[in-house]
Amino acid sequence: QLEGRYRDGMLSNLITVAKDEAFNEEYEQFDIIDKEWTEWFSNGEKRVEVTYKSGGDSKVGKGSGTWNLWFENGNEKLSQSYVDGRADGTWREWFENGTEKKEYNWSSGKLDGKYVEWYESGQEKIEGEYSNGLKEGAWTEYYATGEKKSVESYEGGIPSGEWALFYANSNSKQEANWDQGVLSGSWTEWYADGQKRIEGEIEDGLAIGVWTEWYADGTKSFEGTRKRSVKKEKWTIWNEKIQRSINTL
């Protein structure tokens, strides 16, 4: 197995572990030279292939190169690249059966561009975009069967816009809205069969106005008015045929 360590976003050292022995390449030492090596499994299949080129610069973590790992069955496991000691370019990971697991891009040590994950079956699991190390735009997650599980929206890594959750049968589960990282706007939840469960409004992260909740059979369970806090609430409970007022300090 090959392990790497980072310090301040830069490649610091490599550790290759083979059975009970460990070989440690400390790049923080000032005797860095170009290195290339390959390891094999006992069955003859390639296990690790690493290139490291210092480019004549002996400063900490300034080298460039690639890491490539394989499973014992010969299928690729991991492919990574570095420029000046920082993650750079397209990185890829695979399942042992040969199906791609992840693919994402780096630019000068920061995630940048498209990010995708798959299930072992090959079905897409997650897709989204990074910009300068932060999530940007729409991010979508899928169930193993292919139906959407969630949709999220970001601006500069901060939740923004509409977020939605779905049941495996494709029916909506929850919808909410974000404004620069703060919940604001309508909030709605549904049962798996499509029956509405909860509905209300949020402003600056606080529930306001009329909130209504229903039982699974569609019968209204209660309704209440909120004024940005829990100090004053007035609830009407239909199922129990009781009306009550709640005032808390």
Question: Where on the chain are the PLM-derived regions?
Answer:
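Glycine/tyrosine- and acidic-biased, solvent-exposed loop/turn segments at the edges of beta-strands
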Residues: 1-249
